[in-house]
């Protein structure tokens, strides 16, 4: 009798164990089905400022929960050098916010895909569409940005001209992006080359360098130095200055000298050979369409659209632009060969 009970007990235990193991196997299989489906990666290389990248990253997560969209930041110079060196054998799928001269060089080398079917090129101003293989992200305007509070602390007046920046009282108070690594830095150089001639412009920057606190690697550097009170005067980007003012940095002031606001266009595209991936096409279409419009509306309202205009609080109106004619990569490379800093 006891033997029969033990046999029955053992049978029940075996059945219970079998049921438990079956349930565990089923759960494991189900878990592997869900976890095994890896998200498709889309890699974006960008020279955009951190706050603009953060907006894009957030919007991509909302729009594409099934994709892993990675944004890697580099300065303009670093990004251009990396893409030129790697060609089509790059880990990058999409370029976002690279200076037009470099976009054109990549395009001429066959490195960019035809993106005309993925965005409405007809929406953009005529001067921004120079190839079917890339479209604008924004028009970057430059200005003289001041920390008026720090100038008052130092007991020095606001500068009124480029010539004023050479005065000894501004020694160590000026920050400028290095044109070798920053498109923003170069556009200031190009504007003065066009205004004064190359020899006079180079002579000017030789003198200005005596007052420069630092040549920063990125266009964001001068305004960051102003906020940290490391510098009082920055040759920087109007959109970034406005963004910081709107965030509460009320000691910043935007100023234009007689020569006007230097500017350059920045673009976006897909690396040639990556345009056949559906994920890349979807991400680029969203980036070049909705997100470029949002970028213009929120941060960078200088005109890139034919019919759309946007007002950002505290953004200067009726900007006088500098002469930026002849802004080619060949001219830039020739100038930078003579740049000492």
Model-predicted segments: where are they?
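Short, low-complexity disordered leader/linker segments with a strong preference
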Residues: 1-42
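Periplasmic-binding protein-like
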Residues: 124, 140, 170-177, 204-209, 215-216, 286-309, ...
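Short beta-strand->loop
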Residues: 113-119, 134-135, 163, 250-262, ...
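A bilobed periplasmic-binding-protein/Venus flytrap-type ligand-binding module shared by bacterial periplasmic
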Residues: 145-150, 264-276, 295-298
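Early extracytoplasmic/lumenal segment of secretory-pathway proteins
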Residues: 36-105
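A ligand-binding cleft/hinge motif common to bilobed small-molecule-binding domains
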Residues: 101-105, 227, 232-251
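Extracytoplasmic ligand-binding site segments that recognize negatively charged/polar headgroups
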Residues: 47-48, 52-54, 74, 91-92, ...
